[in-house]
Amino acid sequence: MYKKIFLSLVLLILSITGVSAQINTDRVMNIGRNALYFEDYILSIQYFNQVIKVKPYLADPYFYRAVAKLSLEDYKGAEEDCDKCIERNPFIIGAYQVRGIARQNLGN
């Protein structure tokens, strides 16, 4: 009897909270930006990769990942991410700046 009540409560709670396998991309983006702020560039790239995997059409994760790659001196990767960011949203001015810095360091 108690087992049935317990299972019913668990199912009710799960249905109310909306448990799903999808990630909350806004939250993951915030965590990635915080990692970037605290100069944990590798961790921030991992978080931005998660967002890109789920929503590849967004421009922001490409931009922030480019900033992290630039900080790690991965200039080619930063340039490629800026290109993808600009392709998705040409109004992110910082992407042009980061791409320019990356190209300057590449000698282009």
Predicted regions and their residues:
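Alpha-helical tetratricopeptide repeat
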Residues: 2-8, 12, 18-108
